[in-house]
Amino acid sequence: MVLLSAQNFKRNDINHKLTNQINQLTANAFLHEVVSPTVETTISENGFISYILIDNQIVASGFGKEDTYNPTSKYKTMYIHTFSTKKEYRGRGLCKQLVNEFIKKFGKTHILYLTVRTETNDVNKSAIKCYTNCGFIMLPDVYRNHYDGKNNAMIRVPTSVRKASLKKKKKKKSKKIK
């Protein structure tokens, strides 16, 4: 098993055989026409992709894209999405490995967020468990009705941001006590 990642490639640098495998994996995993960006678009436009190879075949993949919509934001954010695993490889911790690759690469400097379909579905229950085990928390009041049903937001805040936030709260409490 090999875990590979790619970031900010130019379209000419991309191995089209691999991207076709990833696009097919994504389409099969989601069981419908995928609206999400293709591999080429994702990693050539400030994006990141991780995928797992077993016997020269891509069996799991996930995408990430740095959020550039709010340049005045105090913290960098990255939207991670479209985690897919071939059916016969599910339950082996591959999604967790992919999510941890994003955390390793961006978790100290970025707030990571995703949306996950929360309607009853065993695959999504497993996905939510995976994300929760990787340090994401569900934001129950932040959801939208998407083409595939109700989706909730999940977020993982870098340790440095959490520590800074706790220090501010302690300072406010100590000022109130005086």
What are these regions (language model features)?
Residues 47, 149-155:
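Short hydrophobic/aromatic beta-strand or adjacent loop that forms the aromatic wall/cage
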Residues 81-90, 119-121:
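A short, internal acetyl-CoA/4′-phosphopantetheine-binding micro-motif in the GNAT/acyltransferase core
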Residues 131-141:
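Conserved acetyl-CoA-binding loop of GNAT-fold acetyltransferases
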